[in-house]
């Protein structure tokens, strides 16, 4: 039985949050006990600092809140919670939502249309999510809405807008941009060959550098076995930035499971 440090610190009148149940989602089971303990500590602080706002009748309970907080904190497990400064609210719809989108064409005409969004991240504003896609983020499939939007927040710490280059040292920027654009070109080539639906990486990654960083951050944490062998140089840059190696973590967890299985009598 794990001795969770947050339970020791709870005052007697507080109701214990269901952290152990919240950690049971497939994405988090590969973490070591030490990593899980640190992640929960960050998630507790996240819930103290941020306001989760349910919209359109969505019901937010303690388990859902804990799982949302854990996913927010996974990318900053080693970076620290201060990397999530700059927003105070997380707005949560029950399902994908409709927004007004304004864009300018090549001749300067401004167009307005209503589009369906899964999530949004504003540089100096809230993160907007929907519960259906949050639930789909619990497994290790390569899709993770929360990590995607967190990546955008981390990206904008480097400047006024998301560029696909997070806050790294200047001497590393050129190499990062080179490897990121090489990945985008590779993904685009696959799309042209097999089509968007058959591509092994979400086609959205080829749309622009900011989306490539966000999409590949999803794969970094939830499908490292797809990311690492395909883009090894960029993988190493992600490992250095996030200060984590999810592929090594996955291999260690699999080895542990195999060892346990062979020792069952």
Curated annotation (Swiss-Prot):
Pfam families: Peptidase_M90. Its cofactor is Zn(2+). Binds 1 zinc ion per subunit. One of its GO terms (molecular function) is metallopeptidase activity. Coiled coil: none annotated. It is an enzyme of class 3 (hydrolase). It is found in: Cytoplasm. GO terms for cellular component: cytosol. Zn(2+) binds at residues 111, 148, 152, 211. Its EC number is 3.4.11.-. One of its GO terms (biological process) is proteolysis. Keywords: Aminopeptidase, Cytoplasm, Hydrolase, Metal-binding, Metalloprotease, Protease, Zinc. The keyword Ligase does not apply. Interacts with Mlc. Involved in the modulation of the activity of the glucose-phosphotransferase system (glucose-PTS). Interacts with the transcriptional repressor Mlc, preventing its interaction with DNA and leading to the modulation of expression of genes regulated by Mlc, including ptsG, which encodes the PTS system glucose-specific EIICB component. HAMAP family: MtfA (MF_01593). This is Mlc titration factor A. It comes from Escherichia coli O127:H6 (strain E2348/69 / EPEC). The lineage of its organism: Bacteria, Pseudomonadati, Pseudomonadota, Gammaproteobacteria, Enterobacterales.
